[in-house]
Curated annotation (Swiss-Prot):
Its EC number is 1.1.1.130. The lineage of its organism: Bacteria, Pseudomonadati, Pseudomonadota, Gammaproteobacteria, Enterobacterales. Transmembrane segments: none annotated. It is found in: Cytoplasm. NAD(+) binds at I168, T169, M170, V171, D172, M173, S174, W224, K225, G304, H305, E306. This is 2,3-diketo-L-gulonate reductase. The gene is dlgD.
């Protein structure tokens, strides 16, 4: 089915208000969920909203909490989210990293005791729109087996890198081949994954999203490489924030909350003039996209460039929402 941005935001806002969230916070949170969905990231927008409400009702998320600065070391700051709303707090932390970068050339904010930030790419994009390189990542509950294991002991720990090119170039990737949100999107659409994404009941690689969801044996991106990246990203976030690791979140908490996150902004214009920056970025993009195609019908893609097209299509034609997901939200 199709809905407008206004319908989507109103539905989110209604549910948040009914759960006791104050009107200003509810409006800002509903706006972010709707913007994420409108941009085409359904897995961490509309599809994720019922799960967000579940955690709100369980007390994992404290809607009136505000992040608190703990330590300031010039370009580096350490903050405590105090289990506040994840997407609103993440936006504030990237804004703070940008402010630090404006003064120092680079800004780093390490956040502990945080909640799920929903679409991580929103915060990299936020920096790139203002002309900064944006880098951020988060740890999570253990939802992926380390390479060579059967048990989940590492997080998908998504990493975002956004570059202020025209259009914005951005990688937004979990350390698994597919996030659990994308497994859900493909399952709801009745699609197999384009490549293997995890293991079946017999321990064989499979493209069936429902089987992978059931078994909780998701495949690390690049096999041992994604597994290793997940571990070191967790270590850095834990140390810089003085926060909880994947092990602590998984073993000590009843659900995924109290996680650790990193937000970095770099002011490129302190290092290179604007025309030179733009020319260098354009040459990279032209060089990549002018390569001979393996399939004449398949264009060579640059990461993140599809979001400009998806956003325009959703604004023109309405936002696609799965019927079953919409029914869940209407019933909340």
């Amino acid at each position: 089915m199709k809905v407008t941005f206004e319908q989507l935001k109103a539905a989110f806002n209604r549910v948040l208000i009914s759960r006791g969230v104050d009107s200003e916070t509810a409006d800002a949170c509903a706006e972010m969920f709707a913007r994420t969905t409108e941009s085409g990231v359904y897995s961490h927008g509309v599809n994720r909203f019922p799960r967000f409400i579940q955690q709100l009702e369980n007390g994992d998320i404290i809607p009136d909490a505000q992040p608190k600065r703990i330590t300031s070391l010039g370009a580096i700051e350490q903050w405590d989210a105090q289990r506040s709303i994840g997407n609103l707090t993440a936006k504030k932390m990237m804004d703070r990293a940008i402010e630090l970068a404006a003064d120092h050339g680079i800004g780093l904010v390490a956040l502990r005791n945080a909640n799920h930030w929903m679409r991580g790419g929103s915060y990299g994009w936020q920096a790139a729109e203002k002309g900064y390189i944006g880098i951020c990542w988060t740890n999570s509950i253990a939802v992926m087996p380390p390479w060579g294991a059967k048990e989940c002991r590492i997080g998908t720990n998504p990493l975002i890198v956004a570059i202020p090119s025209t259009p914005i170039t951005m990688v937004d990737m979990s350390m698994s081949m597919f996030s659990y949100g994308m497994l859900e999107v493909n399952r709801l659409a009745g699609r197999q994954l384009p490549v293997d994404g995890g293991f079946d009941d017999e321990g064989n690689l499979t493209k069936e999203p429902g089987v992978i969801e059931k078994n909780r044996r998701i495949l690390p991106m690049g096999y041992w490489k994604g597994s290793g990246m997940s571990i070191v990203l967790d270590m850095i976030a834990t140390l810089l924030s003085d926060g909880a690791s994947v092990a602590e979140v998984t073993e000590d908490n009843s659900d995924e909350y109290g996680i650790s996150q990193i937000f970095i902004a770099i002011e490129v214009d302190k290092l290179i003039d604007g025309p030179t920056r733009d020319a260098k970025l354009q040459r990279i993009m032209d060089y990549v996209t002018s390569a001979e195609r393996a399939d004449e019908n398949q264009a060579i893609r640059l990461p993140g460039h599809e979001f400009t097209t998806l956003l325009a299509e959703n604004r023109r034609n309405g936002i696609t929402v799965d019927d079953s997901v919409w029914a869940k939200i209407q019933a909340l």
